[in-house]
């Protein structure tokens, strides 16, 4: 563990097209092996498809989808006297955002559409409508927290 405390959180600059930090975070999540320009093409393609299908501002649709995906509770392992308990804890806002983006991208990759742009657009639209794999993941996380509610007093 570092003796100097936690390093400062880096500020993420907004993306050049939409001027949104959220879109930039999505681009960074989609990026593989440092290929940012490829990730940008995929995300901008997906957002233009979202705009085409909904007729709304794609950034508001994306933020709405992420709000639907963000978990409020999760379980963390806590060891107490030789036994490991799954303790439900509230998710901090920054982590909720990160988890939502991670789930969105991972489940988009698992879809069967032809291109990653189509997959990402489909997953964003599904999440906006409260359906899809990323929403199921959030509900599963909440179910786990609810099932282990008895261990909530072990919270730290």
Curated annotation (Swiss-Prot):
Gene3D superfamilies with a match to the protein in the record: Ribosomal protein S7 domain
Similarity-based family: Belongs to the universal ribosomal protein uS7 family.
HAMAP family, sorted: Ribosomal_uS7_B
Protein's GO biological process: translation
Source organism (scientific name): Rubrobacter xylanophilus (strain DSM 9941 / JCM 11954 / NBRC 16129 / PRD-1)
Residues making up the signal peptide according to the UniProt record: none
Self-association state and partner proteins as the record states: Part of the 30S ribosomal subunit. Contacts proteins S9 and S11.
The keyword RNA-binding belongs to this UniProt entry's keyword annotation: yes
The protein's name in its UniProt record: Small ribosomal subunit protein uS7
């Amino acid at each position: 563990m570092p003796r100097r405390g936690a390093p400062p959180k880096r500020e993420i600059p907004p993306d050049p097209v939409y001027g949104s930090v959220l879109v930039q975070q999505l681009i960074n999540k989609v990026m593989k092996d440092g290929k940012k320009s490829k990730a940008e093409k995929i995300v901008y393609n997906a957002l233009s498809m979202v705009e085409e299908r909904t007729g709304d501002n794609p950034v508001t649709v994306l933020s709405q989808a992420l709000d639907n995906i963000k978990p409020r509770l999760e379980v963390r392992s806590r060891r107490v006297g030789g036994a490991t308990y799954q303790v439900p804890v509230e998710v901090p806002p920054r982590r909720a955002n990160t988890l939502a983006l991670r789930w969105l991208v991972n489940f988009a990759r698992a879809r069967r559409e032809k291109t990653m742009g189509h997959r990402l657009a489909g997953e964003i639209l599904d999440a906006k409508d409260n359906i899809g794999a990323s929403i199921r993941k959030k509900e599963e996380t909440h179910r786990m927290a609810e099932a282990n509610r008895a261990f909530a007093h072990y919270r730290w």
